[in-house]
Amino acid sequence: MSNVLVLKSSISGNNSQTNQLADYVIEKLQGNNIVVRDLSQQPLPYFDTAAAIAVRGEPKTTEEKQLLALSDKLIEELKNAQTLIIGAPMYNLNVPTQLKSYFDFIARPRVTFQYTANGSEGLLKGKKAILLCAFGGLYDEENLVTQYMKSILGFIGITDVQFVYAQGIGFGPEAIEKAQASAKNKINEIVAAL
């Protein structure tokens, strides 16, 4: 049995292609310990000056202490997981703000990464990540969502990353059906190898 953290970030609820794919993965991984964090249904606070002070580990005010406690909770969930499932739809060529905010709260010096003489080093090594990406159009792997997710996960030490794409969903119902079927086939392959 494995610990799995599922991050949903779509604002579209049950209509979301990435949420539907995340639910499909959850169904396939029954029997594991699964924690689901829906960043749209359970929004994180806006990452502002108080949050930046808090995640540096220097909280002084009550608000900053609460933000540090939130960051600690998010990091604990992440540290406990062996596998991370992330729903990452493309909104205006990038990830949703909810997902960006999540990484702002968990990317903490000396906790999830550290600076060394050779540059930054991620501290959350040995984890797997499966990214569920949905795009209205057709994009190659150089798109911003893929590049950002590879970069931020690598920054915190997660380098075993696989991508599942549902592309062209903006082309209509037939395209959605085809994209979902293709994505589910890829998910089946990945889950079988876990």
Swiss-Prot record:
Lineage: Bacteria, Pseudomonadati, Pseudomonadota, Gammaproteobacteria, Pasteurellales
Catalytic activity from the UniProt record: 2 a quinone + NADH + H(+) = 2 a 1,4-benzosemiquinone + NAD(+); N,N-dimethyl-1,4-phenylenediamine + anthranilate + 2 NAD(+) = 2-(4-dimethylaminophenyl)diazenylbenzoate + 2 NADH + 2 H(+)
Organism: Haemophilus influenzae (strain ATCC 51907 / DSM 11121 / KW20 / Rd)
Cited function: Quinone reductase that provides resistance to thiol-specific stress caused by electrophilic quinones.
Subunit structure: Homodimer.
Cofactor annotation: FMN
Key words, A-Z: Flavoprotein, FMN, NAD, Oxidoreductase
Transmembrane feature ranges: none
The name this protein goes by in its record: FMN-dependent NADH:quinone oxidoreductase
Gene: azoR
